[in-house]
Amino acid sequence: MKTIKVLVVDDSAFMRKWISDFLSEHPRLEVIGTARNGREALEKIAALRPDVVTLDVEMPVMNGLETLQRIMRDHPVPVVMVSSTTTEGAENTIAAMQYGAVDFVAKPSGPISLDLYKVKDEMIGKVLHASEANVAALTAPRRQHPSWRPSFKAAARPQQAIVAIGTSTGGPRALETVLTQLPPDLAAPVVAVQHMPKGFTTSLANRLDALAAITVKEAEDGEVLQNGTAYIAPGGVHLIVREEGGALKARFDESPPRAGHRPAVDVLFESLAAIRLCRKIAVIMTGMGSDGTAGLKKLKESGNTKAIAEARETAVVFGMPRAAIEAGVVDVIVPLDSIAAAIVQLIGE
């Protein structure tokens, strides 16, 4: 099996050694170099041609965001960001996801030392996954966000609709593409699960809200879901939807993680399967693994459901869409830029 060559970029000598040592323990990973700042990183990427780069968000000389943008422009390669869990760190990390980073690892917030071992397996796993990412999808130019004027409201709509989106690796960029193309008068609420730890989902929702014509917010337990609003599942809890008093409400579920994920797409989709008097549109986009497929099977069995999967050519990682497609539970397969139009069309039918 091919060895994956990794460049480690961090201004801390301790962190460079720690990341290098941990990655080198895996038989498929070879650390071919390290860099202390963004300028050094760009030189070493050009010279060494790594398969994956780990990149600190906060660095002197050239920070992680500026470095990332230069990497994706000049030497496109899968990048895993290494970030702090501070509010500023989370905001910068979300920006990095939308500039083309494949994924990120949050540094432990406690004292350095044994806390670092908590993210060792996550670091190794995300670097391995990043090596399989579709770099063309990360660097593809994105359509300009539309300025909405026409109304998409249908003349008669006898039944409430709800849109549920599940995504993982590469998801923040995919969510931006879809949510910024939805009209503000969308005749359905949107609920979305993005695999992401607590704290980072707040920054994700805030950034998407600033860009989209619809309202985007982090979901709150017990709130009534409103048309024209997208609700992002908070990290650390499962998001479910319940029908209560004739309204659709967001609820939190603290049951154990599913396949390592909380929130999990399967849990959201399964909760929607119990809602009978509502048309359901499920969307599965880029992500590693198969989260969402089991829940989508239950959704389809419950009836009144249409499912959209992102096409291979635009998915950063095709795992989640492929699993759903191969299970035979998908109605529409479209590239990322066409998902919003497909959602609007299905709501209007």
From Swiss-Prot:
One of its GO terms (biological process) is chemotaxis. The modification 4-aspartylphosphate is found at D56. The active site is at S168, H195, D291. Residues 156-349 form the CheB-type methylesterase domain. InterPro entries: CheB-like, CheB_C, CheY-like_superfamily, Sig_transdc_resp-reg_Me-estase, Sig_transdc_resp-reg_receiver. Keywords: Chemotaxis, Cytoplasm, Hydrolase, Phosphoprotein. GO terms for molecular function: phosphorelay response regulator activity; protein-glutamate methylesterase activity; protein-glutamine glutaminase activity. It comes from the Bacteria. The keyword Nucleotide-binding does not apply. One of its GO terms (cellular component) is cytoplasm. Involved in chemotaxis. Part of a chemotaxis signal transduction system that modulates chemotaxis in response to various stimuli. Catalyzes the demethylation of specific methylglutamate residues introduced into the chemoreceptors (methyl-accepting chemotaxis proteins or MCP) by CheR. Also mediates the irreversible deamidation of specific glutamine residues to glutamic acid. This is Protein-glutamate methylesterase/protein-glutamine glutaminase.
